């Protein structure tokens, strides 16, 4: 007959096993931004957790309590669709978490004239392989310095 303590420990071990098997490996992205105080930002694209690179160890480590995100808003202004993308960070404790854009602003504003949109779509029809540059305003994706990630 199992004691209550043994049963509790067994349940805890099963719960810990399930929790670790459900955790995913971070998918790090490196964003280099010009015109910013930050030279580059490395973050997990799944959770938004910031990472720092340690060249002596050639490893990325999570930066405690910092969250990075890209926020996109859209609006209609004077017959145009305006899409604004800004880089920001979450801060705060508990339920009082706020998002603020980094300063100086990093991101891009795209304006699409809705009256000429039809003409633009027609002009691009029949041209396979039209590709847009892999950049986000003043930012661009950059390769990581290493693939080694140290968990927290």
Language model: regions and residue ranges:
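Bacterial N-terminal signal peptides that target proteins for export
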Residues: 1-12
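Residue-level signal for mature regions of secreted extracellular proteins and peptides
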Residues: 15, 26, 132-133
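Short, solvent-exposed loop/hinge segments that bridge or flank secondary-structure elements
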Residues: 28, 32-71, 81, 95-112
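Beta-turn initiation residues at beta-strand->coil junctions
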Residues: 35, 121-125
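Edge beta-strand at a domain terminus
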Residues: 125-152
């Amino acid at each position: 007959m199992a004691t209550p303590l043994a049963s509790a420990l067994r349940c805890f071990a099963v719960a810990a096993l399930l929790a670790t098997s459900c955790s995913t490996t971070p998918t790090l992205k490196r964003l280099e931004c010009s015109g910013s105080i930050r030279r580059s930002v490395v973050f997990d694209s799944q959770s938004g957790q910031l990472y720092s690179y340690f060249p002596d160890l050639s490893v990325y480590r999570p930066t405690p309590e910092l969250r990075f995100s890209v926020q996109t808003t859209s609006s209609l202004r004077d017959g145009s669709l305006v899409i604004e993308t800004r880089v920001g960070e979450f801060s705060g404790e508990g339920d009082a978490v706020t998002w603020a854009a980094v300063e100086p602003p990093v991101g891009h504003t795209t304006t699409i004239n809705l009256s000429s949109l039809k003409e633009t779509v027609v002009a691009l029809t029949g041209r396979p392989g039209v590709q847009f540059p892999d950049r986000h305003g003043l930012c661009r994706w950059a390769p990581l310095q290493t693939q080694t990630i140290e968990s927290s």
